[in-house]
Amino acid sequence: MGPAELVQKISINAESPRGGERNDCGAGAERGPAGGWRQKCAAYVLALRPWSFSASLTPVALGSALAYRAEGALDPRLLVGSAVAVLAVHGAGNLVNTYYDFSKGIDHKKSDDRTLVDQILEPQDVVRFGVFLYTVGCICAAGLYAVSTLKLEHLALVYFGGLSSSFLYTGGIGFKYVALGDVVILITFGPLAVMFAHAVQVGYLSVSPLLYAVPLALSTEAILHSNNTRDMESDQQAGIVTLAIIIGPAFSYVLYTVLLFLPYLIFCVLATRYTISMALPLLTIPMAFSLERQFRSQNFNKIPQRTAKLNLLLGLFYVFGIMLAPAGALPKL
């Protein structure tokens, strides 16, 4: 081999990446998009705020349990369909909330949901996902009409009432921004959702689910109120008005305490006057005292999530209590 050929061979070897380098680059190229998709999927989940889904799942379970006690039968297709429909509307409403909070400059680097603030998702991504979920909810509602004996006008009234409320909470009128968000949540994720799940099972609208929804609605409102109390300072800076801002920190604590413990008073009345199975939700009262202490100390870190966990457990024990009640023991069933 001549000197010229030797120099040419060395030059070629220097320009070619080593095998280990090629593997590393290839692996990095493969990991990049996969990691990006994983991050984006996680951002979609975060924007949905899944920790809040107890507010929609427990009313569906309660309405279905009330229907079972009233009719002695439960259609699992209607149970699953109503759960998916309500979850889809709830998730879409959370995305609308994410979009409008970001648009109005309310979300910031310390917010629970920073998917738009950190530019993990674009606003149009959130809009498209919200439209998709609303579409899923409407498809489920159509399926429920095909299976249930409930009249179309009654199904549409309750379902689209809930859908409109989930959008108008922050979209359109924006009830959240004019101190009416608490009223919307109290009605939608309580009486309305319970009535919806009950009606698709039994085939008619009834007043009794509205009464049984009261303890659950109060517990659900506690989630929102704890969130609004925590965010009072940033909400004031953004120029929006919530009930927590209007009544101030001291009365916000009083209201939160009432929302936490009034359901237990109702359960005590039901347990002593009708059936002992209604005392099951009282098993969660230590969690309520723990939350009250945390709120009183103004340590609001994760308190909405912890209140949602209490809401889920309280709702499940409430449903179990109704299912275990002797036939005819509960009023209006």
From Swiss-Prot:
<feature type="transmembrane region" description="Helical">
    <location>
        <begin position="129"/>
        <end position="149"/>
    </location>
</feature>
<dbReference type="Pfam" id="PF01040">
    <property type="entry name" value="UbiA"/>
</dbReference>
<dbReference type="GO" id="GO:0006744">
    <property type="term" value="P:ubiquinone biosynthetic process"/>
</dbReference>
<feature type="transmembrane region" description="Helical">
    <location>
        <begin position="265"/>
        <end position="285"/>
    </location>
</feature>
<dbReference type="GO" id="GO:0009234">
    <property type="term" value="P:menaquinone biosynthetic process"/>
</dbReference>
<protein>
    <recommendedName>
        <fullName>UbiA prenyltransferase domain-containing protein 1</fullName>
        <ecNumber>2.5.1.-</ecNumber>
        <ecNumber>2.5.1.39</ecNumber>
    </recommendedName>
</protein>
<feature type="transmembrane region" description="Helical">
    <location>
        <begin position="155"/>
        <end position="175"/>
    </location>
</feature>
<comment type="function">
    <text>Prenyltransferase that mediates the formation of menaquinone-4 (MK-4) and coenzyme Q10. MK-4 is a vitamin K2 isoform required for endothelial cell development. Mediates the conversion of phylloquinone (PK) into MK-4, probably by cleaving the side chain of phylloquinone (PK) to release 2-methyl-1,4-naphthoquinone (menadione; K3) and then prenylating it with geranylgeranyl pyrophosphate (GGPP) to form MK-4.</text>
</comment>
<comment type="pathway">
    <text>Quinol/quinone metabolism; menaquinone biosynthesis.</text>
</comment>
<keyword id="KW-1133">Transmembrane helix</keyword>
<dbReference type="GO" id="GO:0016209">
    <property type="term" value="F:antioxidant activity"/>
</dbReference>
<feature type="transmembrane region" description="Helical">
    <location>
        <begin position="240"/>
        <end position="260"/>
    </location>
</feature>
<dbReference type="GO" id="GO:0031966">
    <property type="term" value="C:mitochondrial membrane"/>
</dbReference>
<comment type="pathway">
    <text>Cofactor biosynthesis; ubiquinone biosynthesis.</text>
</comment>
<dbReference type="GO" id="GO:0005783">
    <property type="term" value="C:endoplasmic reticulum"/>
</dbReference>
<dbReference type="GO" id="GO:0001885">
    <property type="term" value="P:endothelial cell development"/>
</dbReference>
<keyword id="KW-0256">Endoplasmic reticulum</keyword>
<feature type="transmembrane region" description="Helical">
    <location>
        <begin position="78"/>
        <end position="98"/>
    </location>
</feature>
<keyword id="KW-0812">Transmembrane</keyword>
<keyword id="KW-0496">Mitochondrion</keyword>
<feature type="region of interest" description="Disordered">
    <location>
        <begin position="13"/>
        <end position="33"/>
    </location>
</feature>
<feature type="transmembrane region" description="Helical">
    <location>
        <begin position="177"/>
        <end position="197"/>
    </location>
</feature>
<dbReference type="InterPro" id="IPR026046">
    <property type="entry name" value="UBIAD1"/>
</dbReference>
<keyword id="KW-0831">Ubiquinone biosynthesis</keyword>
<dbReference type="GO" id="GO:0072359">
    <property type="term" value="P:circulatory system development"/>
</dbReference>
<dbReference type="GO" id="GO:0004659">
    <property type="term" value="F:prenyltransferase activity"/>
</dbReference>
<comment type="similarity">
    <text>Belongs to the UbiA prenyltransferase family.</text>
</comment>
<dbReference type="GO" id="GO:0000139">
    <property type="term" value="C:Golgi membrane"/>
</dbReference>
<keyword id="KW-0333">Golgi apparatus</keyword>
<keyword id="KW-0808">Transferase</keyword>
<feature type="transmembrane region" description="Helical">
    <location>
        <begin position="199"/>
        <end position="219"/>
    </location>
</feature>
<dbReference type="GO" id="GO:0005789">
    <property type="term" value="C:endoplasmic reticulum membrane"/>
</dbReference>
<dbReference type="InterPro" id="IPR000537">
    <property type="entry name" value="UbiA_prenyltransferase"/>
</dbReference>
<dbReference type="InterPro" id="IPR044878">
    <property type="entry name" value="UbiA_sf"/>
</dbReference>
<dbReference type="GO" id="GO:0042371">
    <property type="term" value="P:vitamin K biosynthetic process"/>
</dbReference>
<keyword id="KW-0472">Membrane</keyword>
<keyword id="KW-0637">Prenyltransferase</keyword>
<keyword id="KW-0474">Menaquinone biosynthesis</keyword>
<feature type="transmembrane region" description="Helical">
    <location>
        <begin position="310"/>
        <end position="330"/>
    </location>
</feature>
